[in-house]
Design a protein with these regions (language model features):
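Mature, well-folded catalytic/scaffold domains that follow N-terminal targeting or propeptide regions
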Residues: 1-110
């Protein structure tokens, strides 16, 4: 489980990094950069364990103020990086998946 969490952490923070860096690349380099990231992300995703029943894990989605407050209490800098990346990705792309992932990351921190 720890290996899977490590992989997911880097998929999310990698997506955040690509989004942040794309505007700085020459236009001709953007599509190749996305293709390279997509290939790496697909390879990493393929290594992750799958739930047998296909049902999503239950998680209480917290408001961002609570998520960030809990993240700052963590002694694991990976939690803070993941929460920051999720917050930035939700702000730029929308979708509740980011707050759901961040809520799961801080679920054990109170």
């Amino acid at each position: 489980a720890a290996r899977a969490e490590f992989t997911v952490l880097h998929l999310v923070t990698g997506a955040h990094a690509v989004r942040a860096l794309l505007p700085w690349l020459h236009a001709a380099d953007r599509l190749p950069a996305l293709r390279h990231y997509a290939g790496a992300a697909a390879a990493a995703w393929a290594t992750l364990p799958r739930e047998h029943n296909g049902a999503p894990l239950q998680v209480t989605v917290l408001p961002w103020t609570e998520i960030t407050a809990r993240a700052t209490l963590s002694d694991d800098d990976h939690v803070i990086k993941l929460v920051d990346a999720c917050r930035e990705l939700e702000a730029s792309q929308g979708g509740a998946v980011w707050s759901r992932a961040a809520s799961r990351a801080v679920a054990e921190i109170a």
